[in-house]
Amino acid sequence: MNQIERREFLKSAGLFTLAAAAAPHALAEAPAMSDATRVTLKGHLATVENHLHNGIIPFWFARALDTQYGGFVTNFDEQGKALPCPEKYVNTQCRLIWWFSTLKRRFPEMPKTAEMASQGVDFLIKNFWDQKYGGFAWKVKRDGSELDPAKIVYGESFCIYALSEYYLATGDKRGLEYASRTFDLLQKYAADTQNGGYYENVNRDWSPEAGGFAGGDRKGLDTHMHLMESFTTLYKASGDDLHRRKLLQVIGLIKEEMTDKATGCGLNQFDLAFSSLPAIPIKRTWNGERLGEKPADPVDTTSYGHNVELEYLMHLALKTANQEGDADRAIYRRLLDHAVKHGVDWEYGGIYRDGLRATGEAIVKEKEFWQHSESLVAFLDGYEQFHEPRYLEAFGKIWQFVQDFMIIKGVGEWRTLLDRQGKPIDPNIGNPWKVSYHTGRSMVECRERLMRLLA
């Protein structure tokens, strides 16, 4: 019995989901809001809106466009000054397409959003699309000439995500066409029909990469979580039942194979059959490019940032698929509760990078931009659903740290990496991996949740 057959058996026996054994967590009825809580929420909304409209949005409008070659430049120092940008990565080109597209959707009267997104799509299709094998290359030189034609499923997922959002924002049929073609290629070449899930690192012709640092023999929560994210937006754009079914398959896989049954936390890396492995840096990843090859993390390591990001992305995915139930809400609460108890730094503010699942002990206490971005959304998402005061307190503790130490006043973006007490380790605010996807999306999503809470 292979992995897929095993999951179908478990499903038929009523044993499939991790949350089946957990106590149901129905949505709580909203209690009457106190005057003090309303004042707190109004204060948070004011600071979020101010940073969004006077910081992040103008920062990227002023700097992202590559006026020489098209597409986007991504590299900026602490003061927002452009740094050399010799390469363009598909994930950050797509994240900026997504950013300007989502601004078009959320703020329809905002000028030039569609134009910025459209020229990004022009550059993406012209320079990244592989005319021979299909799919999008991992990176090109700044002028669009070939550099690394490999197919990285993490990158392909952001192509689907961005192009689907672009279609929803503009109606440009190229968006849905290329998002759907990329999805189809993943099903044809990257889907693991024996074990489930997707191969993550493949060559230009879709043949498997080598193992080890090349990553061809591993699967990870990060990539599959972003496939869930991209399939959610693709299904919104297409309404195609195949897209919905593949979305639900990824969600089921994450719940059954990629989360720890004892704690509810996410597991980081696996072999192809989903046995958990000590996590190693892999080339063409954020950690791999920063750290290179290094000793593996303990197998018990969990990412607080990925856990909370998983909470609200899964919540959105299941709502979009109209498939959410009380057992799923139990999963959300376990992810949030572990992060509140162990990941939030209640002394200095912010949220730690990594910890141990079983004990919850934080083992990497540096403060990185993306975990803070995602935890802000997730804790508001949890507060909106469950009205748990501790979630709102966690939001406030993290948001204050971000305002005090990460956001660069007068510039408008966030430093990349700080120590526990807020001292900069990497003060630059734009790089081939860091644009407005985490920080900008955080402010957009927080704004909408705060407005609903105050309605």
Task: For the regions a language model picked out, list residue spans one by one.
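N-terminal secretory signal peptides and thylakoid transit peptides that target proteins
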Residues: M1-T17
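Glycan-recognition and catalytic cores of secretory/periplasmic carbohydrate-active enzymes
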Residues: L27-A455
